[in-house]
A protein has these predicted regions:
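Short, glycine/charged-enriched secondary-structure capping and boundary segments
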Residues: 28-29, 87-90, 124-126, 159-162, ...
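Glycine-rich phosphate-binding loop of actin/hexokinase-like ATP-binding domains
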Residues: 128-200, 282-285, 290-295, 301-304
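ATP-binding/phosphotransfer module of carbohydrate and carboxylate kinases, centering on a glycine-rich
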Residues: 2-57, 68, 185-330
Length: 330
């Protein structure tokens, strides 16, 4: 929690609500940078109503104005345009009536969580990212974010004729998965038997790491005893063969998918990897075929060679992007 002595009388609220964490911050009027208020684990709350009640209780404990925020922007891991927001990778759901009941007078905007990440990209500094491989980020060119975390998010930022950033959202994590190597084809066969249709999110998220690991165990005839992505990632860092192969495939598939996005969007401004997995296992990412697969685009390999790939290390680009989005509407 922030020190209540630094909280202004009038303020705006931003939230970044994913499948694992719900983060909230305040933004003083006229500012575009958020100041952290609270972070909650989604698993600790049975529904969104409960976390909002907890947030309001924490506000009161900090001496925040009872009237609530002037304006609110929530970035959610769900399609934001529906009347009822149902989170893709958690049981939470809510509608505007619930928000209005909790937030009272606040003007409320809801955006996709990865639209918020994309909006933050132009504001990131060199200290907010780590580059993987060569390539550059051309000013004023399209930038794309892909984020394996609890799920897989994708969004792009382009610029209008006045050089203002425009975010193009979507559900790019749910496009069809296309294997490259023979082993990836074998993994796909097992995932198809389990899920039917296989999107890239079936591989490029925390649960996807487990899916890959279990499929490889079945193919290799080895016991796949680890049950969490954290355990698999840690085991890979300690040279467990099956876990290491799973993480290597995870980052190779991420490289292929990121390269496809670069071709699709013309992302000469760079491709940015968000979410919690890449920063946590950046040592494995650097040793993997991520960049090689990003470049392996046949006749268009040279096109991708010039495009930089970056891991976002900023603590919460979603909150930053939500604050910037809100600032454009003040």
């Amino acid at each position: 929690m922030s020190d209540s002595t630094h909280i202004p009388t009038h303020y705006h609220l931003v939230g970044d609500i994913g499948g694992t964490n719900a983060r909230f911050a305040f933004v003083p009027p006229g500012a575009h940078r958020p100041t952290a208020l609270a972070k909650y684990l989604v698993a600790d709350f049975s529904c969104f109503d409960d976390v909002m009640a907890r947030l309001l209780a924490d506000w009161r404990e900090l001496g925040l104005p009872e009237a609530g925020p002037d304006k609110t922007c929530l970035a959610v891991a769900a399609p934001p345009h529906l009347d009822t927001i149902s989170f893709t990778n958690s049981p939470w759901r809510f509608d505007r009536a619930l928000l209005e009941r909790h937030l009272q007078r606040s003007s409320i905007t809801i955006i996709n969580d990865f639209a918020a990440v994309a909006r933050a990209l132009p504001a990131l500094t060199d200290s907010d990212v780590e580059q993987i491989g060569a390539g550059t980020s051309s000013a004023g060119a399209p930038m794309v974010a892909i984020g394996p975390g609890t799920g897989t998010g994708v969004a792009t930022v382009v610029y209008d004729s006045n050089e203002n950033p425009l975010v193009i959202g979507g559900e790019g994590g749910h496009v069809d998965y296309a294997p490259i190597s023979d082993m990836e084809f074998d993994v796909l066969k097992r995932l198809r038997a389990r899920f039917g249709r296989v999107s890239i999110e079936r591989l490029l998220c925390g649960a996807g790491i487990v899916n890959i690991y279990q499929a490889l165990g079945d193919i290799r005839g080895l016991p796949a005893e680890l049950i969490s992505p954290e355990d698999i990632g840690t085991a890979a860092q300690h040279d467990n063969p099956l876990a290491a192969e799973a993480m290597a495939m995870f980052f190779a598939v991420l490289g292929s998918s990121a390269g496809n996005l670069a071709l699709t969007t013309g992302a000469m401004g760079g491709v940015f990897i968000a979410g919690g997995i890449a920063p946590r296992y950046i040592d494995l990412l650097r040793r993997s075929d991520f960049r090689a697969r990003f470049l392996a685009k046949g006749r268009f390999a040279d096109y991708n060679t010039n495009i930089g790939t970056f891991v976002i290390t900023h603590e919460d680009p979603g909150l930053l992007g939500a604050a910037l989005h809100l600032g454009e509407r003040l």
